[in-house]
Amino acid sequence: MSARRTAASLGVLGATSLTLLTLTPTPASAHGAMFNPVSRIAACYAEGPEHPVSQVCKDLVADSGTQPLYDWNEVNIANANGQSRQLIPDGRLCSANRDKYRALDWARTDWPSTGVAAGQFDFKFRVTAAHSGTMTVYITKQGFDPTKPLKWSDLDDTPVATYRTSRTATDGYYNFTGTLPARTGRHIIYKVWQRDDSPEAFYSCSDVVYGSTTKAAAAPSEQKMTADAPHSTVAHHGHGGDPTPPAATPPSPSDSTAPQALAAVSTASAAAGGLLLLRRRRG
C-alpha cells in the first residue's frame, strides 16, 4: 500500500474520530432553585411535568414541553460575570433570557404562589451543587402590575436579602433570613445568585401574595427529585471552579455519552489500524 493511500486512510479515520467526539452531547449545568417562596419552575415541576395541575403549568408544558420542568434547577447564564442587567432584557428576567424557559416570563396572575406578610422571612434554597458566591433577593415595588412583563425597574433597589453562599450546604439547602417590606397584593420575588468562583449566575421568580391565607404552593419532594433524575439533561461535573463533582444529584443518562463516544472512537481506530497493517503486508 502506498504511503499516499495510508495517509489518506488515516485522514479519514481522524475525521471520523473528530466527528464522533464533536457529536457527544455536553451536559448543561444546574445548581438549585428557590423552595421558599417556591419559584415558578419548581412549583410547576412539583405538580408533575407529565400531568401538571394548574392551568399555567399545563400551558407551560404545552408551549415548551416537559424538559424545562425536569431541568428545574438550571435557569442560568454561564458567562454572566456580574452583568445580569446588561444581558437580560426587560420582560425576560424570569427566564434569564433563555428561550428554553420562555414560559416563565408569562405575565399571569395564576402562577402558584406563597402567602407572605411584612417582616422577617425565612428563605429556603434547594442546592444541587453548592458554590461560593452571593445570592441577592429583590421584590417588586408597591404598585407593580403582575399582568405586565417584569422589568428591572419594577424591582425595589434595596434587596430584601443578601446571602453569602459557600461550597457546603446543610442538608442540601441554603437557609437564610430576609426582611419583606410592607406591600399589598401580588408581587414577584426575584433572585440572582452570582458565583465568585466562576462567571456563572442563576435566576428565579417566585410569586407571593401579601395577606393571602391560601395554602402555599408545594415545593418538589426529595423522593420526586430522585425518581425524576434520569429525565434531567443537567449535570455538575467540576465545571467553572468546582474542584470535585458534587454528589447531591444522581448523574443523568447524558453523563455516559462521552465514554461511549470515546469507546466508539477507540474501536474504529483499532479496526482501521488493523486494516492498514493487513493491506501493507499484502502489498
Where are these regions (language model features)?
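N-terminal "mature-chain" segments and other terminal, solvent-exposed stretches
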Residues: S29-M135, I139-D145
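Extracellular Ser/Thr-rich, low-complexity/disordered mucin-like segments
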Residues: E222-L277, R282
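Short, hydrophobic beta-strand segments
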Residues: V127, Y174-R183
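Exoplasmic/lumenal beta-rich domain surfaces
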Residues: Q142-G172, G238
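Secretory targeting and sorting signals
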Residues: M1-A30, Q260-R280
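Short beta-strand elements
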Residues: E200-E222
